[in-house]
Amino acid sequence: MREFLDRAQAAVGDDGRLPLGAMTEWDVFPFEREGLRARALTDYANPEPDRRKAPADCKTCAALDRADLVLHGGERLAVIRPGGCNLPFVANIVSRAHEPLDELDDDGHVELGRLIGRTYAALRALEGIGNVHVSKWENGTGHLSVTLLARPLGVLQLRGSNLAAWADMLPPTPAEELDARAAKVRAALAAR
């Protein structure tokens, strides 16, 4: 994919940066266009560096060992939550071992699909949730990680693909609120 980066590099302006895209005009984009600029593109990296962490340094492995953070435990996949977040609720469907999505077999894919649907429904049923956004980013620990982010009802500016950027700027949700929601999600996942 070197040609992809070459094509992108050919599109940079005089300042060495790509022009801002149409997303900056969206009403849900979290930043004002004025003064905003893209970072300069980095060099091509192939092979890519190994970003997996040793189990002793892995936050996902640590979370899997904490009963208060585990919402559902299966043999191969689990549903966990972060210790804190800035949204009404966040859940992660993760592999118990350092196993990315492309290493799951068909049974793992079936289990993942069921857990996405069940976890989505559990979060969507929480009071005050307007929608649940589902995404997959597994670029850090070596675990499969599908993230489900609960958007608060009526806060339309947080709609869409910028929810994670907004969440990074919002104040922390009180722990007691997260704990109460975790109990409801845990019960919903256990009920099936």
Q: Where are each of the predicted segments found?
A:
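Active-site microenvironments that recognize anionic phosphate/pyrophosphate groups
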Residues: 1-91
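C-terminal helix-cap and adjacent tail motif
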Residues: 17-18, 28-35, 152-192
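Short histidine-centered catalytic/ligand-binding loop motif
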Residues: 91-115, 166-174
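Glycine- and small hydrophobic-enriched segments that form the cores of compact globular domains
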Residues: 73-79, 101, 111-114, 139
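A short glycine-rich, hydrophobically flanked beta-strand micro-motif that places a catalytic Asp/Glu
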Residues: 127-140
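Active-site helix/loop of acyl-thioester processing domains in fatty-acid/polyketide metabolism
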Residues: 110-126
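Short, charged/polar surface micro-motifs in flexible loops or helix N-caps
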Residues: 85-86, 99, 152-155
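A short beta-strand motif that forms the metal-chelation/ATP-contact edge
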Residues: 144-151
